[in-house]
Amino acid sequence: MQTENNEKPLLGADNNALVALLAVNLVGYVILGLIKVVYYLESLPLEQYAAQIFQPLTLSSKWISSPWSLLTYNWVHDGFWILSGNMIWLSIFSYTLQEKGANKHLFPIYFYAGILGAISYIIIGSNQPLFGAGVSVTAIVVASLALIPNHKLLSNLAGGIPVWILGVVFLLLQGYFLLDANMATDIATICGGLAGFVYVMLLKKGKDFGKWMHQLLHLLNNSLAPKN
């Protein structure tokens, strides 16, 4: 007799990768905002907040003193509109990948893009810190363009909008904003997009470099998920 599997997914839904990505970015922004408010209420200078809390989470030329910034920089934001823009684009293109069954690849693409972007940023070097989800979001966009360029969103609206059109809009906007950025940030963003492209190309050849992450999540789900 078969036993029913009463385990629930860790975040409560099978297609939770996008929810998880959004949650980490949004919760991180709220937590940093609350800490900033505490500094303000305690009449502490915001420069102190930046030096003690925010800057150690961003990637800078002094990354060796805060090596964790290699993993945290692409999860932190300091502006509501920048955060909103990144999360909207992340949602649009992650959703298209989810529709094509690539949900489990969202986090690996986000992760590898962040690492490759960080390495390239360190190699080029810059006096300005790197932070925000832009590098990883670019990877998700490029991955969507490489995998499903003709997939249509809002199909009930005049036949739908092809992914490639939205991708071109994103890349044009990204290119415009990068005009004011330093070379290290430009290269990091390009490398992030390259990570998304290479990941998809390898996936098409049957090479899943996110497999170890899938296995880790499965292990965590079995260990921590609530059971009925």
Predicted regions and their residues:
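C-terminal transmembrane module of polytopic alpha-helical membrane proteins
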Residues: 1-16, 26, 174-228
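C-terminal ends of transmembrane helices
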Residues: 4-8, 90-98, 149-156
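N-terminal TM1-TM2 helical hairpin plus the immediately adjacent luminal interfacial "cap"
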Residues: 14-130, 178-188, 201
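Membrane-embedded alpha-helical segments of multi-pass membrane proteins
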Residues: 84, 133-141, 187-194
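Alpha-helical transmembrane bundle and helix-membrane interface signal
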Residues: 99, 147-160, 205-210
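Cytoplasmic-side transmembrane-helix entry/capping segments in multi-pass membrane proteins
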Residues: 104-112, 132-137, 157-167
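Membrane-interface micro-motifs in multi-pass membrane enzymes
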Residues: 127-149, 163
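Hydrophobic membrane-spanning alpha-helices of multi-pass integral membrane proteins
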Residues: 163-178
